[in-house]
Every structure is written in C-alpha cells, then in structure tokens.
C-alpha cells in the first residue's frame, strides 16, 4: 500500500509542466450550497494567504470560515486531524506532508465532492491514490536560482547553470570587489538546511535508500559531493549564514547584498513586486532553473505541488462547505487577481516572470521530493545532524555517520528497519 501510494503521489508531482499547460474550464463562483464550518490549516506564505483570503470571502450567516497560516503546520496537522471532530476541516499540504495523513487515514476521498462542486478543476489537479482523489493541487513550487543581472553584467559572466559555475562566479565577483559575500542559501539548522542537502542530492541522480528497502544509502560519493559543495559555498556567504532561512533570504536579497541564491519559487514574486521590493534590486533580479551538480544534467532541486485535502473526522456538511470554499480560493478569478503569487496549476493561468524558475525545474526534469513513508525520518535526521558540519565543526564522513545513526534509530522505532 505504501509503495503504491508513493509512486502515485510522485506521479502527480512530476506532472507540473503538463498542469501549467492545461486548458480552460468553467469559472467558479462563491456561492456555497448549505451550511457548515470551514477551518483551514496551511503553511504561511503569500500564495497560501491569497488562497485562504479568497476562501474566507465565502463566509455567510450559515458558513463560518477561519484560517490558521503557520510555519508549524506540519507539526500541527497530525494531532489536529486525529481529534474527533478534527480541529481543522482543511489541511493544505505538499507532496511530502500529505503522506502521514494518508498513512493514518486522516483525510477523506474527494471524488463525490469533485463531481458535485469541481467543475472548475482540471483533471491533472486531481491527486489520486489507489484510484481515489485525495487532494486538489493548485500550485507548483521548488527552489531555484535567483541572480542579479547587473552584477553578472559588470563581471562579464553568463547566468550559471551548475553549482560549479556558481562557485567560480562567486570568486570572480568577490575578486572584482563587486560583493564581499555574493552567495546565500537556507542554511539555518532545521528543515531548511536538510532541504538544501535533499535538493543537491536529487541532482546527483543517486538514490536515498536501498532498492525496495528503508536502508539509508547516502553514505557514498554523491553524498560527499553534496556536502563538499554546501561547505564550499559558505566561503562566499555572510558569516551569519547559519541564521538564514527562506524568509530571511528574501530580506538579504532585497537589501542588495547577494548575487546568487537558491530560493522558493513561491517567494519569487515578492522580490520583484513593484509595491514592496527594492526598485533597484527588483529591476535587476533574474530567475532560472536550479543549477546542476557534479556533471549532472537535471536541476538539483525537488519538484513540489501544493494542494488541499479535506479531513476525515468531520461532518459531511462541513466537508462540503470546506471543499466549495477552497475551490473558490483557487479559482481562475483568484489566480487572475494574483498572477505572480505562485506558479499556479489552475485553468487560464499564464506564467509570468516569477514562474520562470519553477517551470525551468519542471521542464528540465527535476525530480519530485521523495515520497517514501520514511523520507520524513531522513529529513529530520539531516535537520539535526548537518548543523555541526555546515558550521565547520566536523567533516563530511562524520556528518554522514551522524545522519545514519539518527535515521536508523528513528526507522527502527517506526518499524521500517529491524
């Protein structure tokens, strides 16, 4: 069951390029049939706030709608949806955070709701597990290259396409006195730091686990190449690089202090927003697919989709109201009003400049974030055990040993390893 689930969800993730090219569909209207309570749990960034606000506009005297947008959503969702009735009726998920909800039976099939209220949805938005629709995808995401066009021009450099190029270009930019610290990345110990490793490792083409098993397989040449590259980049970063998460990166970028960074596509729009971004930096901000690594040919970044699910432990009335509100939240009208907030997977969306990087990842063959049920245990182990390495306190061999020890312990406790 879990392996089928993994393959099916991954297939949904890698269809992002096709989703973006999807055709038209009927426009949604905010006219919820019936009554109910809609309680949304999501991550906290611009695109999801747009969706939540649009969904909330459907509130009436008989339909109450609330939303909790928080970076802690992944930690909250399991316990909150386990309660009966569930604390939230809607969980906005990505292709990693849906897995525990599926494994624990905390979200419901959506086929009946799609048939009744989903006229505006495209077929490829329907994330199916074992033939049942379990989530509705509405945006593609991924970390990709942000670069300063003016700095490259002054240095006489082309847009880099590999991490090796980025390191060489950073040296040129520093030697020319254009910037002291031309690089930045999400190296804050925790989820962000682990994602940096996962992205680069995906670019090597190597497997995270032994074939058909939960045994860890990153202690290899590819794993060392990734760590070597991560460490090499810190030589061109501000000394406080350990404090940078994704949100902090945008602040550093807007201040004009960085020439290259790997950042989320969902945050690209903010860097060129004429209403809020530094005009000089915004005018010189460019986007491209994530770089390759170690002679690889595919962008070294995970491909993601974001979508919504409906809780199992709620009334059918609340489920129907929640589905209708969320369909309005991701409607073509919402997307038309906020075209640069995300790489939308919605009918009628025309990709703008902020979508270039995510589309480049998808068309370049970037792989979906791994969907094995034990991948979360590896991500957690990387989150904790790479901190000393990225700080320069231990070598790659020790870091890989530490990650394996932490992962093996968790995988045994979870029943994945003996």
Mark where each language-model region is.
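Conserved N-terminal structural module of periplasmic/extracytoplasmic solute-binding proteins
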Residues: 4, 10-12, 27-97, 242, ...
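C-terminal lobe and pocket-closing loops
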Residues: 266-282, 293-384, 414-418
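Hinge/lid segment of periplasmic solute-binding proteins
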Residues: 95-142, 158, 167, 196, ...
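Glycine-centered hinge/linker elements that transmit conformational signals in sensory
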Residues: 170, 213-242
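Short, solvent-exposed loop/beta-turn-alpha elements that line the ligand-binding surface or hinge
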Residues: 108-121, 183-190, 204-225, 274-285, ...
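Extracytoplasmic/periplasmic solute-binding protein
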Residues: 134, 143, 167-215
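Short helices/loops that flank or line small-molecule/ion binding pockets
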Residues: 74-87, 103-104, 151-152, 171-176, ...
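A structural signal for short loop-to-beta-strand junctions that line the ligand-binding cleft
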Residues: 79, 87-89, 117-152, 181, ...
């Amino acid at each position: 069951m879990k392996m089928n689930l993994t393959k099916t969800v991954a297939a949904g993730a890698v269809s992002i390029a096709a989703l973006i090219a999807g055709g038209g569909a009927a426009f949604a209207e905010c006219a919820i049939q019936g009554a109910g309570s809609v309680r949304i749990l999501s991550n906290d960034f611009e695109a999801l706030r747009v969706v939540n606000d649009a969904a909330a506009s459907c509130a009436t005297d008989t339909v109450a709608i609330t939303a909790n947008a928080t970076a802690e959503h992944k930690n909250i969702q399991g316990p909150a949806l386990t309660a009966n009735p569930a604390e939230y009726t809607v969980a906005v998920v990505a292709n990693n955070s849906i897995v525990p909800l599926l494994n624990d039976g905390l979200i419901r099939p959506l086929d009946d709701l799609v048939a009744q209220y989903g006229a505006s949805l495209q077929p490829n938005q329907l994330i199916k597990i074992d033939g049942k629709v379990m989530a509705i995808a509405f945006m593609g995401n991924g970390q990709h290259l942000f670069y300063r066009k003016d700095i490259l021009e002054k240095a006489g450099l082309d847009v880099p396409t590999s991490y090796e190029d980025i390191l060489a270009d950073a040296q040129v930019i520093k030697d020319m006195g254009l910037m002291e610290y031309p690089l930045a990345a999400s190296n804050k110990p925790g989820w962000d730091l682990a994602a940096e490793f996962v992205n680069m490792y995906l670019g090597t083409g190597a497997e995270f686990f032994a074939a058909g098993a939960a045994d860890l397989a990153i202690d290899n040449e590819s794993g060392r190449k990734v760590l070597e590259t991560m460490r090499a980049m810190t030589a061109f970063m501000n000394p406080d690089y350990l404090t940078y998460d994704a949100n902090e990166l945008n602040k550093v970028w807007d201040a004009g202090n960085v020439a290259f960074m790997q950042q989320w596509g969902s945050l690209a729009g903010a860097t060129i927003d004429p209403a809020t971004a530094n005009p000089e930096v915004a005018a010189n901000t460019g986007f491209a697919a994530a770089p390759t690594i170690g002679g690889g040919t595919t962008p070294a970044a995970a491909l993601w989709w974001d979508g919504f699910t409906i809780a199992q432990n709620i009334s059918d009335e609340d489920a129907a109201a929640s589905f209708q509100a969320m369909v309005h939240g991701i409607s073509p009208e919402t997307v038309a009003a906020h075209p640069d907030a995300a790489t939308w997977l919605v009918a009628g969306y025309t990709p703008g400049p902020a979508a270039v990087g995510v589309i480049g990842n998808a068309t370049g063959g970037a792989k979906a974030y791994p969907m094995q049920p034990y991948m979360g245990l590896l991500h957690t182990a990387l989150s904790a055990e790479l901190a000393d390495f990225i700080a320069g306190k231990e070598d790659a061999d020790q870091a890989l040993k530490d990650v394996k020890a932490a992962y093996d312990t968790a995988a045994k406790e979870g029943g994945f390893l003996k």
